[in-house]
UniProtKB/Swiss-Prot annotation:
Gene3D superfamilies: 3.30.230.10, 3.30.70.240, Elongation Factor G (Translational Gtpase), domain 3, P-loop containing nucleotide triphosphate hydrolases, Translation factors. Keywords: Cytoplasm, Elongation factor, GTP-binding, Nucleotide-binding, Protein biosynthesis. Catalyzes the GTP-dependent ribosomal translocation step during translation elongation. During this step, the ribosome changes from the pre-translocational (PRE) to the post-translocational (POST) state as the newly formed A-site-bound peptidyl-tRNA and P-site-bound deacylated tRNA move to the P and E sites, respectively. Catalyzes the coordinated movement of the two tRNA molecules, the mRNA and conformational changes in the ribosome. Pfam families: EFG_C, EFG_III, EFG_IV, GTP_EFTU, GTP_EFTU_D2. The gene is fusA2. Belongs to the TRAFAC class translation factor GTPase superfamily. Classic translation factor GTPase family. EF-G/EF-2 subfamily. It is found in: Cytoplasm. It comes from Syntrophus aciditrophicus (strain SB). This is Elongation factor G 2. Its main location: cytoplasm. InterPro entries: EFG_II, EFG_III, EFG_III/V, EFG_V, EFG_V-like, EFTu-like_2, G_TR_CS, P-loop_NTPase. The lineage of its organism: Bacteria, Pseudomonadati, Thermodesulfobacteriota, Syntrophia, Syntrophales. SUPFAM superfamilies: EF-G C-terminal domain-like, P-loop containing nucleoside triphosphate hydrolases, Ribosomal protein S5 domain 2-like, Translation proteins. PROSITE patterns: G_TR_1, G_TR_2. One of its GO terms (biological process) is ribosome disassembly.
Length: 677
């Protein structure tokens, strides 16, 4: 058998989950057992290596994706630890775009939680193969098989339990490996470093045999080789099983399921084995696709150092005042000190240093190639979503989609000295975070920051003071609205004026129609653009686009509208781009007024998990907030309530929910749609 290539021995994986499922603890154990960390960091002590921002250590949650590299079984594993809090969904989205595989962590007590579903569907969107780890098997209420059942009900991929627990809750001792037909137990004295495989005890044999049969039946449905041997009653070897599980996992037909307790140091090494055995190397994923920046011809790049360079910038961070750009290299190579080409901006930039990251520590590299995830210093122009490539063989990869902010807050510098720092700090934070928006309100002389939720803005404000020494006074959070129209209208805009010594003319007729909620904006030319000079066409579109952004009535962006450009009148010697831009803008504003402009507010999908005894209080509170209950699902002693609630009614909800349920309920929310309140 030929030796494996370096690429085939790389794994780019993410660790993703709902908040508090224990994924940072899983990451810490992985670093410890692979020798990258000499001391186990605990989240509850604020010592987790991967959670290196002060805000993360105080809150015990992960905010920005930390990247680290470790080695296991002669394979190089690049791990991105991602946040589970919905306010930081963008971090998960960015990570999944550049990963090849994911470890999804579930809480054995809570099961499939709302954010677990969100991240799972995000992974599906990018076709990322997954393995599942059911964590916290030592906790009271842990139920492995219930979580597997929930996965089956909620997700399209079929869960394949390749382990079952040896005991549960305070009786959790280890796992039964259904592939090897052995029990795996861990030595507490060595903090789980030492573990052993042994024969299955007699009282667990029947249970193990029955679950292995289920595993074989599931595999037989997706793999002909296994089906043939299974039906013939032939023995199925360990290598047969590993091959079949790998192929089905890579095809996203199955998700291998494992279990353990990261906090109690049980179950992590088999997860590392599964990462190596079942998740893809860069060679296993399809070639990355893009277009030629000039000709728009479709192109692809295979994962090979022999191909021309193609890479995607997926994250920007400030590190001690210097900009670090995280890059996934899909093909080719890059060297420290060489010039790189930004295909979208058509600019060359020098990569002064290449770094391999370990959370917030680093190792300098001379070069990096296909399959690597590295941090680059020296890229001043490059931002998240930009393509880096070979200038002679350019390719533009698909950029990244970002969510629109739903909440805003006014801030003002405490002193004139803070004001100078504030402007620079916000520019740097916006570079890092594409979901953070900043604008200056001329009327109130306040800076308004907008983001994905209260926690998101809290962290931004905290970082302004802590990292940039820019201290601010904070206003109350405000909801970001949108506008649309109720009725179809036919309107005209006319502009005719002498400015200086030149006459300017423009005449535009538009039809505005309301569209379905969430369907966006559509601009359609009905007038014949072939007879119009290109600068007039551009001016009409600019007039409409600018009015869409600045709003027609209340100053909010206009959404869910179809704009048909029916006529563009010409006047020889007087027609001008200024005239058409103003006429189009005037027609659009007039149309919004006549079409009965209405305000839309963000509606959030809220999921509350509460003890059943507080269900009535929680539902009553949601109704009082003008929420609409979608489903109520009993979950043992708990109950899951899903509802749609206007964001403006949710400020301070976490405090109210805590006091109504004695701190025993948890909730998540994420943007659902803009609609009338």
């Amino acid at each position: 058998m030929p030796p494996k290539s370096r690429l085939s021995r790389i794994r780019n994986i993410g660790i993703i989950a709902h908040i508090d499922a224990g994924k940072t603890t899983v990451s810490e154990r992985i670093l410890y057992y692979t020798g990258k960390s000499y001391k186990i960091g605990e989240v509850h002590d604020g010592e987790a290596v991967m959670d290196w921002m002060p805000q993360e250590q105080e809150r015990g949650i992960t905010i920005s994706s930390a990247v680290t590299t470790c080695n296991w079984a002669n394979h190089e594993i690049h791990i991105i630890d991602t946040p589970g809090h919905v306010d930081f969904t963008i971090e998960v989205e960015r990570s999944l775009r550049v990963l090849d595989g994911a470890v999804v962590v579930f809480d054995a007590v809570a099961g499939v939680e709302p954010q677990s579903e969100t991240v799972w569907h995000q992974a599906d969107k990018y076709g990322v193969p997954k393995i599942a780890f059911i964590n916290k098997m030592d906790r009271v209420g842990a139920d492995y098989f219930r979580v597997v059942k929930m996965m089956k009900e909620r997700f399209a991929s079929v869960p394949l339990p390749i382990q079952i627990p040896l005991g549960q809750q305070d009786q959790f001792l280890g796992v039964v490996d259904l592939i090897r037909e052995k029990v795996v137990t861990w030595d507490d004295g060595s903090k789980g470093v030492n573990y052993q495989y042994s024969e299955i005890p007699g009282d667990r044999e029947a249970d193990a045999k029955a679950n292995r049969e289920i595993m074989l039946e599931i595999l037989a449905e997706v793999d002909d080789g296994i089906a043939e041997k299974y039906l013939e009653g032939e023995e199925i070897s360990e290598s047969d099983l590993l091959r079949a599980i790998r192929e089905a996992t890579l095809a996203n037909r199955l998700v291998p399921v494992m279990c353990g307790s990261a906090l109690k140091n049980k179950g992590i090494q088999p997860v590392l084995d599964a990462v190596v055995n079942f998740l893809p190397s860069p060679e296993d994923v399809p070639p990355v696709r893009g277009i030629h920046p000039a000709t728009k011809e479709e192109l692809s790049r295979a994962s090979s150092v022999k191909e021309p360079l193609s890479a995607l910038a997926f994250k920007v961070m400030q590190d001690e005042g210097r900009k670090l750009t995280y890059i996934r290299i899909y093909s080719g190579q890059m060297k420290a000190g060489e010039e790189l080409y930004n295909a979208g901006k058509k600019k060359k930039e020098k990569a002064s240093r290449l770094l391999k990251m370990h959370a917030n520590k680093r190792e300098r590299l001379e070069q990096a190639g296909a399959g690597d995830i590295v941090a680059v210093m020296g890229l001043k122009e490059t931002v998240t979503g930009d393509t880096i490539c070979d200038e002679k063989n350019p390719i533009l990869l698909e950029s990244m989609e970002f969510y629109e902010p739903v909440i805003s807050q006014a801030i003002e510098a405490k002193t004139p000295a803070d004001q100078e720092k504030l402007s620079l700090a916000l520019l740097k934070l916006m570079e890092e975070d594409p979901t953070l928006r900043v604008k200056y309100d001329e009327e109130t002389a306040q800076t308004v920051i907008s983001g994905m939720g209260e926690l998101h803005l809290e962290v931004v404000i905290d970082r302004l003071g802590r990292e940039f020494n820019a201290h601010v006074n904070v206003g109350k959070p405000r909801v970001v609205h949108r506008e649309t129209i109720r009725n179809k209208v036919d309107v005209e805009g006319h502009f005719e004026r002498e400015l200086g010594d030149k006459k300017h003319f423009g005449h535009v007729r538009l039809v505005l129609e309301p569209k379905e909620r969430g369907s966006g904006v559509e601009i359609e030319w009905k007038a014949d653009t072939a007879i119009l000079p290109a600068e007039y066409v551009k001016a009409v579109e600019e007039g409409i686009q600018e009015s869409l952004v600045s709003g027609a009535v209340a100053g909010y962006p206009v959404v869910d509208i179809r704009i048909k450009i029916l006529e563009v009148g010409l006047k020889e010697g007087e027609s001008s781009p200024i005239g058409y831009k103003i006429a189009a803008s005037s027609a659009f504003r007039d149309g919004c007024i006549k079409g009965e402009s209405v305000l839309l507010q963000p509606i959030m999908a809220v999921n509350v998990i509460t003890p059943a005894e507080f269900m009535g209080d929680v539902i009553g509170d949601i109704n009082a907030r003008k929420g609409e209950i979608q489903t109520i699902t009993p979950k043992g002693a708990m109950c899951e309530i899903r509802a749609l609630v206007p964001l403006k009614a949710l400020f301070g909800y976490s405090t109210d929910l805590r006091s109504a349920t004695q701190g025993r309920a948890v909730f998540t929310m994420q943007f659902y749609a803009y609609d009338q309140g």
